[in-house]
Structure formats: C-alpha cells, structure tokens
Amino acid sequence: WFVDLRFPGHENTNIIDGVPEGWEKKSVDSIYNIKYGKNLSTKLITETGFYPVYGANGVIGYYDKANCNEQVVLITSRGNGSGDVLMTYHKDAFITNNSFIVTPSEGFEYCKLPFTFQFLKMANFRAVRTGAAQPQLTNQSIHTVDVILPNKNLIEKFCSATIGMNDTIIKYREQIRLLTEARDRLLPKLMSGEITI
C-alpha cells in the first residue's frame, strides 16, 4: 500500500516531497531502543524446557531462565539472515546475542508490536550488513537506516485493527508447538509397535 500511497485517508492527504503530509523521515534508532540479546552457551540450550531461546532464525531450543519478559520484535544480527525481522511469540523468552531486541523509545509507545513488526520488515537492514565470510549487522550500521514513519493516528488505527490477529497467531503457534511435541512422542512408539491404533 505504501508504494501506491493507498492508506486510509490518502484521498485527502497532501503529498510533500514524495511523502504524505504528517509523515516523517526518521532514523530507526530515534523511534526504537535497539539492543543486543545476551550470550548463551549452546551447552546450556536444551530440547525441552520452560523458556524458548531465540537465535538468529527463531526458536533454537529452551533454557531455564528468561532475559525478556514481553513479546518483542527481533532483527537478526549474524549469519545469512542478518537484517531479517522476526517476532517472538512468547511473553517470556531468552534472546541470544544473534539478534537485536527492538522496543519503542519513550514517546513512541504507540508503535506497538504488530505495527513495529510489519513496519521494520519494510526497512532495508540488509543494505547495511558488513562482513564478507559471515554477514552481520552491527550497532553502528543499524542506526544508519532511515524509515518513513506514518502519523500517530494512522499507526494507532493499524494497531487497533491488528492486535486481535496477533493474539490469534500466538494462540495457534502454541497449539502447533504442543501438537508437534505430541507427534514427536507418539510417532516413534507407533513405528516401533509399542502402541497401536
């Protein structure tokens, strides 16, 4: 919708320098707090546990402590996926230092999770990656990325319209996780003949 500028109210909005009136060009770090997760030895990550561990590409295992107590947006900082934007689907999780944790800065609290996730997916973080053998995104490079921020009213309307969808996604992802665990427990027993249907 941004390319065609077909946002709610676009018919009555003036376009100034290619940007709708009331929208602003800003650096990502002026809108969001962006910090690395914490280092965690792979020896401490288990296949089951209480808190999911988020690495560069999503959940990589479990750990007995959380370092993040809210659902957040992540930006992958290491590997081929550097610059990819992800979202945690758990309120309590451990975020490794292979990702940046993104939360709204003071004054931008209205940039809630559903908006932040979709908004940052449109930012070109891959353009500022460094490293030849292993691509990476650094604190210095990520802060050079500029974005066009819609006006507060439009962001609030977006968040209001999508927050229920986000809750539904979380609910279904948890069901998928539980069903996957059940499948992984039952399938070997069915194949070995330990249980029959």
Region spans (language model):
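A short beta-sheet element
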Residues: 55-59, 63-145
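Active-site-proximal helix/loop microenvironment
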Residues: 1
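Non-catalytic DNA-recognition/assembly elements of restriction-modification systems
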Residues: 4-39, 44-55, 148, 152-190, ...
